[in-house]
């Protein structure tokens, strides 16, 4: 298989939306975006597709992602970002715009929002000075083709070129394929968070954080 890594484009929005939703779920059935959006899967995907295209630039904007084309087909994606200048707080205004475009109300989104506190008990904290790798996923038909290894290499190089000397990535405890991929890319265990409220909500004990030098 021929794999090419490239910058994401606006026409990749559907792939990026799927990547975000699946990466958020990891190997479980529910993830952070299910909670935030609190809608059926098709509506979650619509929301995330719009979010990747919603200006101004933010953490989940399409420009932050890299895509792996396998034999000419978009097969996998991930993103890397600066948590200080382009972190989670940058998503708030674009999300509000998408909520308005989709006609969602606070009542529509309330069920998942009520569970966010339980999720955040294990949400990894940013490591000082680290480039953050996030939203990593491969279409099922292209798994084991080496796309993630090449994407990780490329996104780490992107962080390195932006002046970062360290990178971090987090994953759900029990996601063995993710653990193996990150170890192969040079990441090492830093810490983990476990909480019974998180496990009751998600189905796994918590989250692990890996780091590596760049």
Language-model region placement:
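A short beta-loop-alpha structural element at the N-terminal edge
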Residues: 4-18, 25-31, 82-83
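Conserved GNAT-fold acetyl-CoA-binding loop/helix
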Residues: 25-52, 98-104
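Active-site rim helix/loop that mediates acceptor-substrate recognition in acyltransferases
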Residues: 39-65, 69-70, 75, 114, ...
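Conserved beta-strand in the GNAT
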Residues: 67, 73-82, 132, 137
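Conserved acyl-donor/pantetheine-binding loop and adjacent beta-alpha core of acyl/acetyltransferases
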Residues: 84-130
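Conserved GNAT acetyl-CoA-binding A-motif
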Residues: 131, 159-170
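Conserved acetyl-CoA-binding loop-helix of GNAT-fold acetyltransferases
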Residues: 144-157, 184
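C-terminal "cap" of GNAT-fold acetyltransferases
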Residues: 165-168, 172-176, 185, 195-214
